[in-house]
């Protein structure tokens, strides 16, 4: 046998076994390593489970650790599922032996010190009723500053069971009791001048359910206003108010108010760490009580904040929130709510009267009208003028009157300036019963820096961006919402739904959308941060606006609309989200407003050089669902009233205004007019004064108002003036190039080709005789409106009620009309047979 063969035989006989054994040992070693790692992971999981169980023991299941106290059935508000309950409690235990000082001193010195300083982050771990480790005794502790003596009494019979002993300075009282069975108790506090029987808030179960916490943490709780804030309710069989506040970075939070002497030590709140919300149910506190939240920041600062979800507040300049009961208002506007989707569609006539409630009309002593008084006066006034909608400047509570409501602090509270919330509901209902829709100006773009508001709410930049290049609006000195934080976006979307659901508003006009869309809005180079792609588009705001519109259209009552105040050329603002748009129903046409007002300011002798300012808007009129807005922004800040913008003497200024309003109503787009413009107020709007109603004694002003009423009725009655506002087939120029005579003419066309009106506008004070325009059909063209009619304060020139066509080709049409054009006037003619 060769050497090679011998080695092979040896390996076959002996050598492989040791190698296999080594392999097996290596595998066994690796398996043991894996097992060791698994055991370490299991140990860590057990540690985490232990910590979670401790949190749950402290914060979620106090009933299990407080003398095994059984609670009545609690309905999980978010899910509607009743939680299981234990049997009814046994009769209360009567304590025979007196309490001793040793029994009372059952609190760690550190816990006592933090309670007395109002700095305890887990009051439920100390206050209330707690089982001792032996499970044979319980300890009851309560913090009642000012109480000379505190007794434990039977909840059913009010019998005194024991007297608690004061601890330390005497503001904390405590006692140890034997606990052979369940104990249901109340506290009887003896003060210097009164005795009060109290239910212990620290013996109550949590207010928020697990589903609430889950949805709040994800920013998907569309009913957040029904869980956060202050809610009078029956909880654990007790009447009181549940308080809940999102302040994840605060070290401790208390609710303070008129019910506890504004003492932050009395009602310290429990933190739900899974969502960053602090909560406490306070028995015996009811509607009307004033309150705020006292927060201690991680830096040790103390803050006193109004409730972001408060549904009522004190009237400014006071800043406390007020507990408000759930409304039991019995709405009677079902018919309107069913039909409003059609009344607010893109094909419907929409003519909006914009109102600032504080300055529309006032009492002789200067007081503003209340909601009910406005309903008595404003609704019939607007309805008589033929408007379809009222739009209210922001009414969410705001501290600074000079902001007109555009710097709100309490977004869920109708301003107390004009009454209580149900009075606002009555106003909206009466508008609906009168056939008027109600739109609300809504401000999600920014908020003021008032100390009691949202700024640095829990000591951190909770609602706003931390970087001032994103979080500060320099033009308004306000803070910008951090829309990329889902809790903040949820706060705003829940607020939008709140107004639409709870007050039956028919839509929201969303303020300052352009400032939301652009990161460099009103910022110089170096003062803004680009997005992740290096651009200036605010991607978080785009996502928020799309989500807002989708939510409103899905979850608000049917037919609610959204309108964007967007002043740039951002595309597809009113296109559906599914098509790549922002999802608004309508967009203010700021370009039309700026161009046409600049034209009207020009002296008529020079207008022929600027005719493009009137016609340019028709190049993009079909790109969006537009609202032609002549709003409050155009009559303030030294801009003058609409009438003051018009050139010429008094007669010419009124004639120009009448012409401009007629031009607006005959132009494609929905209509909006700010209060006072309907009668040609001469003075610039002042938010501290009512409108100049005395001007209606002037025939010229009365004539302007009469014209506005007739324009509204004509606009609503003639389908060709509104059905195809965003359809190029609904408009056709007759002549847009007669700059020499400064005259333009067009047709508005309805669903049928023969349903149209002819509009002719003369923008000079020179009457035009024999002015010929082409028309498509032969027949008599009845004059529907003449802004120069004597009834409106004009000269009375016109066409004697109408004109018959002549077979003279003009402007590419086989027929034409020979017209007398009054000075500074608009004429509207109906098609033959219409």
From Swiss-Prot:
Keywords: Carbohydrate metabolism, Glycogen biosynthesis, Glycogen metabolism, Glycosyltransferase, Transferase. It catalyses: Transfers a segment of a (1->4)-alpha-D-glucan chain to a primary hydroxy group in a similar glucan chain. Its EC number is 2.4.1.18. Disulfide bonds: none annotated. Pathway: Glycan biosynthesis; glycogen biosynthesis. The active site is at residues 511, 565. It holds the Pfam family CBM_48. It is an enzyme of class 2 (transferase). GO terms for biological process: glycogen biosynthetic process. GO terms for molecular function: 1,4-alpha-glucan branching enzyme activity; cation binding; hydrolase activity, hydrolyzing O-glycosyl compounds. GO terms for cellular component: cytosol. Catalyzes the formation of the alpha-1,6-glucosidic linkages in glycogen by scission of a 1,4-alpha-linked oligosaccharide from growing alpha-1,4-glucan chains and the subsequent attachment of the oligosaccharide to the alpha-1,6 position. Monomer. Belongs to the glycosyl hydrolase 13 family. GlgB subfamily. HAMAP family: GlgB (MF_00685). This is 1,4-alpha-glucan branching enzyme GlgB. It comes from Burkholderia thailandensis (strain ATCC 700388 / DSM 13276 / CCUG 48851 / CIP 106301 / E264).
């Amino acid at each position: 046998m060769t050497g090679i063969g011998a080695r092979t035989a040896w390996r076959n006989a002996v050598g492989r076994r040791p190698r296999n054994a080594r392999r097996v040992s290596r595998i066994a070693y690796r398996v043991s390593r894996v097992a060791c790692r698994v055991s370490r992971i299991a140990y860590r999981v057990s540690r985490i489970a232990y910590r979670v169980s401790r949190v749950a023991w402290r914060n979620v299941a106090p009933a299990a650790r407080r003398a095994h106290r059984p609670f009545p059935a609690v309905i999980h508000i978010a899910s509607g599922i009743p939680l299981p309950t234990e049997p009814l409690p046994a009769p209360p235990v009567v304590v025979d032996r007196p309490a001793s000082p040793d029994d009372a001193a059952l609190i760690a010195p550190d816990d006592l010190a933090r309670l007395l300083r109002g700095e305890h982050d887990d009051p439920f771990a100390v206050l209330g009723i707690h089982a001792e480790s032996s499970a044979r005794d319980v300890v009851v502790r309560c913090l009642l500053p000012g109480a000379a003596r505190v007794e434990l009494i039977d909840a059913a019979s009010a019998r005194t069971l024991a007297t608690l002993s004061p601890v330390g300075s005497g503001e904390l009282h405590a006692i140890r009791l034997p606990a052979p069975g369940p104990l249901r108790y109340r506290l009887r506090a003896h003060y210097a001048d009164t005795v009060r029987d109290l239910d212990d808030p620290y013996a109550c179960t949590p207010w928020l359910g697990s589903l609430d916490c889950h949805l709040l943490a994800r920013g998907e709780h569309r009913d957040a206003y029904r869980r956060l804030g202050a809610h009078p309710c029956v909880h654990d069989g007790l009447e009181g108010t549940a308080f809940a506040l999102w302040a994840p970075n605060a070290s401790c939070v208390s609710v303070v108010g008129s019910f506890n002497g504004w003492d932050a030590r009395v009602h310290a709140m429990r933190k739900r760490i899974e969502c960053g919300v602090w909560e406490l149910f306070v028995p015996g506190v009811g509607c009307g009580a004033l309150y705020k939240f006292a927060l201690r920041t991680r830096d040790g600062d103390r803050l006193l904040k109004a409730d972001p979800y408060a549904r009522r507040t004190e009237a400014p300049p006071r800043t406390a929130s007020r507990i408000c009961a759930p409304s039991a208002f019995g709405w009677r506007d079902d018919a309107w709510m069913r039909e409003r989707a059609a009344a607010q569609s893109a094909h419907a006539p929409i003519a909006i009267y914009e109102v600032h409630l504080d300055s529309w009309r006032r009492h002789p002593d200067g007081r503003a009208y209340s909601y009910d008084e406005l309903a008595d006066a404003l609704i019939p006034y607007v309805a008589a003028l033929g408007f379809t909608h009222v739009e209210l400047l922001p009414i969410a509570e705001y501290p600074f009157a000079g902001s007109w409501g555009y710097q709100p602090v309490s977004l869920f509270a109708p301003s107390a300036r004009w009454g209580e919330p149900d009075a606002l509901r009555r106003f909206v209902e009466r508008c609906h019963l009168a056939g008027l829709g109600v739109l609300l100006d809504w401000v999600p773009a920014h908020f003021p820096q008032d100390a009691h508001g949202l700024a640095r709410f829990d000591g951190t930049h909770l609602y706003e961006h931390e970087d001032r290049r994103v979080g500060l609006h320099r033009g308004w000195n306000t803070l910008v919402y951090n829309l990329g934080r889902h809790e903040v976006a949820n706060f705003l979307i829940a607020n939008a739904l709140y107004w639409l659901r709870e007050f039956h508003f028919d839509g929201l006009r969303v303020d300052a959308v352009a400032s939301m869309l652009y990161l460099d809005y009103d910022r110089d180079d170096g003062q803004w941060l680009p997005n992740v792609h290096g651009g200036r588009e605010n991607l978080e705001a785009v996502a928020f606006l799309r989500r807002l519109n989708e939510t409103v259209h899905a979850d608000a009552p049917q037919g609610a609309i959204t309108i964007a105040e967007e002043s740039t050329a951002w595309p597809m603002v009113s296109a559906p989200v599914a098509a790549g748009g922002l999802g608004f129903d309508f967009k203010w046409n700021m370009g039309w407003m700026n161009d046409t007002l600049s034209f009207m300011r020009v002296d008529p002798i020079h207008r022929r050089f600027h005719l493009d300012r009137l016609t340019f808007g028709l190049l993009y009129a079909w790109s969006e669902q537009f609202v032609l807005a002549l709003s409050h922004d155009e009559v303030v800040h030294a801009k003058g009233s609409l009438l003051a913008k018009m050139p010429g003497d008094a007669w010419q200024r009124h004639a120009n205004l009448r012409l401009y309003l007629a031009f607006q109503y005959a132009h494609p787009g929905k209509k909006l007019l700010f209060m006072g413009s309907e009668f040609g107020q001469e003075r610039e709007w002042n938010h501290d004064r009512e409108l100049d109603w005395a001007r209606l004694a002037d025939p010229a002003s009365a004539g302007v108002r009469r014209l506005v009423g007739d324009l509204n009725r004509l606009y609503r009655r003639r389908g060709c003036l509104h059905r195809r506002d965003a359809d190029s087939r609904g408009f056709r120029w007759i002549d847009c190039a007669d700059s020499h005579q400064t005259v333009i003419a067009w047709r508005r066309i309805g669903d049928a080709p023969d349903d149209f009106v002819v509009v002719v506008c003369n923008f000079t004070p020179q009457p035009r005789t024999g002015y010929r325009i082409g028309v498509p059909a032969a027949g008599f063209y009845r004059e529907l409106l003449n802004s120069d009619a004597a009834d409106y304060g004009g000269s009375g020139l016109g066409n004697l009620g109408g004109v018959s066509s002549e077979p003279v080709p003009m402007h590419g049409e086989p027929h034409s009309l020979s017209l007398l054009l009054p000075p500074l006037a608009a004429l509207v003619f109906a098609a033959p047979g219409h």
